[in-house]
Amino acid sequence: TRKMIPRKKGTIIFTGATASIRGKEGFAAFSGAKQAKRALAQSMAKELAPKGIHVAHVIVDGAIDTPWVNKLFPEYVKEKKKIDGLMKPDDIAQNYLMIHNQPKNAWTFELDLRPWVETW
């Protein structure tokens, strides 16, 4: 923010998960951390908006087609790829860029991204 405040522009995007808005049995620590991150993003959004800095929180709910996911979950990936059920990094990036390019009169604070087959 040191460089953004004098310029009166900039974008900070936090990445969360469904746990940012909803807890689940066995995920107390994870949910608590994600909800705290969301609260930090909300506070920063309110503090920095008057200074021209756009702060957003993106919930990414679903597996992302990366080498790491492909290696750890090969059967899951195989099934999801049959139905276009994995998120692609470039598609996620397009949404982040869309947030960055929004005009000040129509800023998004929160965006949920998930494959069409994800249950939520």
Locations of the language-model features?
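Catalytic loop of short-chain dehydrogenase/reductase
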Residues: I5, T11-A36, A41-Q42, K46-P50, ...
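Short beta-strand segments at enzyme active-site cores
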Residues: G10-F14, V55-V58
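A broad, structure-centric signal for solvent-exposed, well-ordered loop/edge residues
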Residues: R22, A28, P67, K71, ...
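Short beta-loop-alpha junction of Rossmann-like oxidoreductase domains
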Residues: G26, I53, H57-F73
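Short, hinge-like loop/turn segments at secondary-structure boundaries
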Residues: S31, L72-Y76
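C-terminal helical subdomain
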Residues: P50-I59, E75-W120
